[in-house]
Amino acid sequence: MTRTFEVTPDKASRMQAAPPLSAQKGTMVQHSILIIDDDADIRNALQLVLKKAGFHPLLAESGQAAIALMEQDEQAAGVAAILCDLEMPGMNGATVIAHFQRHYPMIPVLVLSGAAPAQFLDAVGQQGVGDWIRKPATNETVLEKVRGAVHLFELRKAGRRSKDRPST
């Protein structure tokens, strides 16, 4: 059965949960995922899907709210991936993505969009976007892309740690 993240919260709450992410020593690793979308139904459905999979979703209804959250919220320090709608009122997704790529280059950004004009695709393609999720997407696709982004974040973080160690 194929499920999409365009579900009502009551349906999303009944979805089968994926196993949580675990660390090497068996302790729970709960990565934060920032969801930026002006559609409350999509934000809430994604929140349920990601929470059931063991992630800690942080929600923002606009680019401005997402930037403020990352600057002020202590939990934002643990953000391992960002899901950003491309078409939003006010600050559009391309502008938001450019901000996050400048200020948080280690965090992969996944673009969410139902239909994006070519100029947006060109703009985000030059900004190192991690991947693309076309709306509507199955929950499995969303989780696969998010897990891939978290894996990329962990690789970047590990690479940074190895660069910070003194040479012997």
PLM region spans:
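Acidic catalytic/metal-coordinating carboxylates
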Residues: 61-65, 89-96
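Two-component/phosphorelay signaling modules centered on CheY-like receiver
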Residues: 40-58, 127
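Alpha4 helix (beta4-alpha4-beta5 surface) of REC/receiver domains from two-component response regulators
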Residues: 95, 116-133, 144
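The short loop immediately C-terminal to the conserved phospho-acceptor aspartate in CheY-like receiver
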Residues: 39, 82, 86-87
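C-terminal output helix
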Residues: 119, 137-150
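Acidic, metal-coordinating helix/loop segments flanking the phosphotransfer/catalytic sites
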Residues: 59-81
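Short amphipathic alpha-helix used as the core "switch/output" element in two-component signaling
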Residues: 68, 94-106
